[in-house]
Amino acid sequence: MPEARRFDRVLAILADGARWDVVERLATAGEMPNLRQQFLACGGLRCATSVFPSVSGPAHLPLLTGLHPGRANLPGIRWAERPLGKRGNFLFRTRSYVAPWRPAKLERDVPEGVRTLFHHIQGLADVNSWFVRGCPLAARMTRFSKGVTFVKAWVTADWHAENAQAEAAVQRAWQRGFSSVCAVFPAIDELGHRFGPESEQTLEGYRRFDASLGRLLGELHRRGVLARTLVLVTSDHGQSATHTHVDIGDLMRPVYPRTLIYPTLWRHLFSAQAAAMVSGNSMANLYLQGEAGWHERPDFEAAGGRPAELLARLLNHPAIAHLIYRRAPGIYVLAGRTGRAVVDARSVGADDGSGDGSQPVRIGFTVEGENPLGYAPLPGQMTRDEVAALTAGTGFPDGPWQLVEFFRSPRAGDLIVCARAGFDLRSHFEYQPHNGSHGALEREHMLVPAAVNARWLDDRPLCTADLFPTILSALGLPVPGGLSGRSVPLGG
């Protein structure tokens, strides 16, 4: 293998909501000329698998921390913690990051031992990151402008202004002497939600992002540091088009009349029988009391019980693609209308499955009835790498392993709902019309670009958790253990 290339600074960009197939198509066609010339031409543009849930916030963590959000106990952009007693008291037990004070909430919610790029890279400035642990206040370039820019963009319906703000903040960081920057560019995601992921308005967002990227590359060249700067562009998730909105709470109330749901938390806050926390609008964590109360977990396979009734009702609804639940500790079921896929992860320990390959543990995979993920027959036992390789070209890439990682979170719901493509799970209280959704295991949600101004030297399937250790290695910095991804060498 050729000698790995080294850099002494980094510009890491997360283009929120950018879908792999759209980026590949536009770059190949020359509509994103900077990505084509500076990344595709040198072998630096690849597809990567994101994480489940494929939503902003949790899906930012692989780049920022090298961890799947399940390991950081973040099962969604909204989640809850089950009540401790028999009554359904959810006071102070719910969370939404679609609200002010995201960094403070994430600082409290993510386990204390989780470290970020800001801890590892000296002189790293932040632009629009959600999780800023380890970043000095002086290095937070958008601490105040982020919220102001969002409100202005919402009022004027000019979501391109968010990317203009991000570009200006990156330039400002360099002017203030910061050698490295980690930046989130939000516009593609907002445009995709508003107009649809492949609308002309959203495609124009991709083109304008590429123009911003070109200006930033030009500034690095003008400063004489482009060759020494690792430039990395990725995303947290894609989107699929949405034509029908369904309220998951309405589907639950015939079985659980006292269902708690955002933002009307005052209803049943102290006496809920169930709670629904929607993320990305295509995925929801449902929390359900057992037959004897909240001190008991629901049993979805006990005939005649309310959990089984809800499962059957949801599976028969046209908006629902998959339901996921724990059959037993370490055994997870993904149910469709005509069959179930069962993942047995009992052999996977707390630190097993690390991306460095030091723990090549195997998970079990069996199908009852028809395979709800549509896979060709798979081996009954697979390593993490085998799961990634064998499912890469399917409609649900890396699905079995994503369940293993997701259920590491104690906050994960009792029942996980994934909407069918074209539908979502939230019909009220959105700040703008939603014609694009994400959060589920769908290919369009899970596959994102991973671009570097170098050449990837490893052709194994790539995931976004690989980017954190890859950045550290490329900068000559030590890579901590226990990560969800592995370092991938980069060539010239």
Regions found by a protein language model. Name each.
Residues 1-44, 483:
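Active-site-proximal N-terminal segment of extracellular/periplasmic enzymes that hydrolyze or transfer
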Residues 7-23, 38, 63, 121, ...:
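Beta-strand elements within well-structured catalytic alpha/beta cores of enzymes
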Residues 24-73:
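Short, structured active-site-proximal loop/turn typified by the sulfatase FGly-forming signature C/S-X-P-X-R
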Residues 49, 54-55, 77-105, 222-230, ...:
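Secreted, luminal/periplasmic, and some membrane-associated catalytic domains
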Residues 60-200, 205-208, 333, 339-393, ...:
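His/Asp/Glu-rich, glycine-adjacent segments
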Residues 204, 266-282, 293-307, 445, ...:
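A short beta-strand-to-alpha-helix junction
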Residues 321-335, 477-492:
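Polar, surface-exposed loop/tail segments
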Residues 408-466:
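Low-complexity, glycine/alanine/valine/leucine- and proline-rich hydrophobic stretches
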